Each structure stands twice: as structure tokens, then as C-alpha cells.
């Protein structure tokens, strides 16, 4: 089996790329970073530090790399069996034209074997969004062939991969936590279902997408925002602060109540899942910076993301949300000289005030009780 993976960054190398290579799949990375491409093609291997209760170093070998903006990547798409991505949500649109060209070439060469594409991004139904971009880049005459031969498979991914401490001297070395979860929608595949250790197949993907979004992502973001306000450097430092931990755990329990109501998750098992995530935040080997985790607050405060979406669920079912509101208020306070969205958020609040700014960013009604609650919490944490 041959696979092409877009995105040779830390998540690409440390998570999805590693799982594919470990499964014996012939793997080629596609990226724009020439330093990483050259290193991969010189060595065809790299080291992954897996850290947790037991630390180990795994070697991923037998890999190649191509530029994601050249002809080589188009040629590869015509022949591989699987395409995966870990490029970040905003980059999906940028790689779509190359994928479209590769699919056209595949059709022209008469390659009718099924191809499956899986976007492994921190977003809801990312592959469906990628499919939209790819279809927009195709001529009408090619769309029916693509619909018939190409599976666009949505997934939920979960593994904390912080920037590597050794990145200064080895561009390929990466550190990851022990925990990983890659859940894919088995109803969207073309051809036979693949058997890849570490890939879990489900016919109820949205339950797992929202479980991860409402728990890991919600908790991670609130830990970062409260941690930044309290002057903590890392996620571990922040979650060991009992006052922060209480709010984070409370917020995950509030979002969890929505999941239990919506999808019928077992309450005891979900409580154990929350505890597992709190344990992951405490991992002493992961130097996960609160500023990195908190960046892009405008996206994280948008209607479909990790703070507002669970809040909307509590409103839908008439459930408590006091800790989620505290997290939203902390996000509104996020400031970072490194992050354009943080600067835009600050300017918007300065211009319009917290009430109108939050309503504009989140889509919530400016005159609603919940916006008033968030503004009160925001003012109380100044």
C-alpha cells in the first residue's frame, strides 16, 4: 500500500505519518519546508520520542518526501492508495488544487483503483471541507469520476504534539505523548476498508468528533487561557493550579453533560475519559506552552468551535454552564504579541466593548443572558 501525507510538521511526523509507516505502508511526505524535505530524503528516517509513564524513542524508517507545490506530488496522487493530511485547517484550501490536478492525471492514466483521502485536522468534518475545495478546482467533466473512485473520509484525531525541544539541531526529531486516537468514518471509504493499527473505524463519527472537541479541545483551551491570566508558562503548570483545575474539570463536566444527553455516552466512562485528559495535561514530559495552545482566539470563540459549541449545547438542553462561561471570559482576555488574532480580538473589544465583540465573534445574541454572564465574568477577571 502506498500513501501520500501532506504536512511533514510535528503532527504529520509524530502522529499520522508514524502510524502509516509503522503499518508497513510506503509513505511519502509532501511539504513546503525545504529543510525538512531535504533531511527526510537524505535519511529516509527520523526519531519520535514517545513520552508518558514510560519514555521510549521510536525510529520511523523507509519514508520519502516531495514538495507539495511541484509536479512530483501531482504524479504521486495518480498512483497512491491513500492520501492523508495534517496541515492545519486553513491550509486545506491551498493543497486542494494540487490534489485536483493529481486526480485528473489519475483519471487520464486510467487508474480506476479506489483512492481514499483523510484530512486529519483539528476541526469538524475536515475532509468534507477539503472535498469542497477539491471539487471547486475540478472541471465539471471530472467531478463524476472523482465521486465514483475517490473516498473523502472524515476523521477525528487526538494526540498532543508540542514543538520539539530538539528542533533547533534536528529538524526531524519530534516528541509526542503516549496517548493517540484516530477515528475514521467507515461509511465514506471507497473499496475495501483498510486495516491500519491505531486507526479506529466507526459509523458514528460525530459522537467522537464532538467528544474530543468538547473535552480535550475545550479543556486544553480553557487551561491555556486561565493559565495565561495567572502567569503560568505551561499547560502542566496551569492544570496543577487547583483553582484553574476546578474550572477546567467543571467545564469538561458541563460539556460532557451535553454529550451524554446528545449521544448517550455512558456517564461513568465519560467521567473516566475526563480524568484521563486531565492526566494528559499533567504530563511532565510535554512542555506545552499556554501561549501556543491559546493562539487563534477568534477561531476558538467562533460558533462551531470548542468554547461556544458546547455552550450552545447547554442552552439547547437547559444545562449548567458556569465554568464554560468562565473559560470564554478568559479567552476574551488572551493577549499575545505573536498572534495576530489575539491582537485583533483586543482591538475589537477596545472598539466595541466586550458585549458587542463577543456577540460578533461567537454569533451569540448580544442581548442574551449568556452573553451578559460572560461579560460579567470577563469584567470580574480584569
UniProtKB/Swiss-Prot annotation:
Annotated GO MF terms: mannitol-1-phosphate 5-dehydrogenase activity
Catalytic activity as recorded in UniProt: D-mannitol 1-phosphate + NAD(+) = beta-D-fructose 6-phosphate + NADH + H(+)
Coiled-coil regions listed: none
InterPro entries reported for this sequence: 6-PGluconate_DH-like_C_sf, 6PGD_dom2, Mannitol_1_phos_5_DH, Mannitol_DH, Mannitol_DH_C, Mannitol_DH_CS, Mannitol_DH_N, NAD(P)-bd_dom_sf
Highest taxon above the source species: Bacteria
Keyword ATP-binding: no
GO biological process entries: mannitol catabolic process
EC number: 1.1.1.17
Family matches, as Pfam families: Mannitol_dh, Mannitol_dh_C
UniProt keyword terms in alphabetical order: NAD, Oxidoreductase
One CC-aspect GO term: cytosol
Claim: Metal-binding is one of the keywords in the record: no
Binding site for NAD(+): 3-14
NCBIfam families: PRK02318.1-2, PRK02318.1-3, PRK02318.1-4, PRK02318.2-2, PRK02318.2-5
Family from the record: Belongs to the mannitol dehydrogenase family.
Name by which UniProt lists this protein: Mannitol-1-phosphate 5-dehydrogenase
Organism of this sequence: Salmonella schwarzengrund (strain CVM19633)
Lineage: Bacteria, Pseudomonadati, Pseudomonadota, Gammaproteobacteria, Enterobacterales
Amino acid at each position: 500500500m502506498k500513501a501520500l501525507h501532506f504536512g511533514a510538521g510535528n503532527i504529520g511526523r509524530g502522529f499520522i505519518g508514524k502510524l502509516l509507516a509503522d503499518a508497513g505502508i510506503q509513505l511519502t511526505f509532501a511539504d513546503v519546508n525545504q529543510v525538512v524535505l531535504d533531511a527526510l530524503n537524505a535519511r529516509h528516517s527520523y526519531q519520535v520520542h514517545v513520552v508518558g509513564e514510560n519514555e521510549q524513542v521510536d525510529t520511523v524508517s523507509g519514508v520519502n518526501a516531495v514538495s507539495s507545490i511541484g509536479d512530483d506530488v501531482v504524479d504521486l496522487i495518480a498512483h497512491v492508495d491513500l492520501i492523508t493530511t495534517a496541515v492545519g485547517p486553513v491550509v486545506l484550501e491551498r493543497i486542494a488544487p494540487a490534489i485536483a490536478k493529481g486526480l485528473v492525471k489519475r483519471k487520464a492514466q486510467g487508474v480506476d483503483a479506489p483512492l481514499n483521502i483523510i484530512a486529519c485536522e483539528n476541526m469538524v468534518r475536515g475532509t468534507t471541507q477539503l472535498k469542497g475545495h477539491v471539487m471547486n478546482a475540478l472541471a465539471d467533466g471530472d467531478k463524476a469520476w472523482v465521486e465514483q473512485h475517490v473516498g473523502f473520509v472524515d476523521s477525528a484525531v487526538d494526540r498532543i504534539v508540542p514543538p520539539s525541544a530538539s528542533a533547533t539541531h534536528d529538524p526531524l526529531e519530534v516528541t509526542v505523548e503516549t496517548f493517540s486516537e484516530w477515528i475514521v468514518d467507515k461509511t465514506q471509504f471507497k473499496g475495501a476498508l483498510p486495516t491500519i493499527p491505531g486507526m479506529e473505524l466507526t459509523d458514528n463519527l460525530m459522537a467522537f468528533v464532538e467528544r474530543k472537541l468538547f473535552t480535550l479541545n475545550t479543556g486544553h483551551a480553557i487551561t491555556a487561557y486561565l493559565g495565561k491570566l495567572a502567569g503560568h508558562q505551561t499547560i502542566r503548570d496551569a492544570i496543577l493550579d487547583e483553582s484553574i483545575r476546578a474550572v477546567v474539570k467543571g467545564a469538561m463536566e458541563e460539556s460532557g453533560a451535553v454529550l451524554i444527553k446528545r449521544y448517550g455516552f455512558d456517564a461513568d466512562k465519560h467521567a473516566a475519559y475526563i480524568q484521563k485528559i486531565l492526566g494528559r495535561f499533567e504530563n511532565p514530559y510535554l512542555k506545552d506552552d499556554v501561549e501556543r495552545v491559546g493562539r487563534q482566539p477568534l477561531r476558538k470563540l467562533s460558533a462551531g468551535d470548542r468554547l461556544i459549541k458546547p455552550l450552545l449545547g447547554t442552552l439547547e438542553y437547559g444545562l449548567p454552564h458556569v465554568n464554560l462561561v468562565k473559560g470564554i471570559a478568559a479567552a476574551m482576555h488572551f493577549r499575545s504579541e505573536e498572534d495576530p488574532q489575539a491582537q485583533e480580538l483586543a482591538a475589537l473589544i477596545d472598539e466595541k466593548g466586550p458585549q458587542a465583540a463577543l456577540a460578533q465573534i461567537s454569533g451569540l445574541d448580544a442581548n442574551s443572558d449568556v452573553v451578559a454572564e460572560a461579560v460579567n465574568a470577563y469584567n470580574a477577571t480584569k
